[in-house]
Amino acid sequence: MTRARGASRSSFDVLARSFAIGVAAGSRASLGLAPPLLTSSLSGPWGAVAKVVGALGVAAELTGDKLPTAGSRLEQPGPPIRMVSGAVGALVLARRAEAGVLFPLLLGAAGGAAGTWGGAAWRAAAVGRRPDWQAAVVEDAVALSLAAFATRP
């Protein structure tokens, strides 16, 4: 009975991480792929290059989102890209945990949808109450926290 509980918690953990990385990707598309990449065991020159590119991608998106010229995440192809990013991030995390991939993949995509429309709703609700960049920074903090949770050791 102890093994079943341990396995169940492990499965739940993978699923929770999958949804979390999906929600993070819905907020910032780069957060589906970059955090799993940055916390991977990739080494050597190509591993270093991949990690730098991932970090720069996140930094660029976090910065670009604050610009007045940033488009809506709800414009096409925004939602599908964010859902795919969440699904791929969840797939990487599931493979890393040596778990099945179907449910994590689905939860990553669902989290991507939740983060996309939930984040847009948060930003719309914040309009007029505070400057948009402040609402964006709060969303960044939530998304980065979810990505950190999803990729923790």
PLM segments and residue spans:
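Short amphipathic, positively biased membrane-proximal segments
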Residues: M1-P153
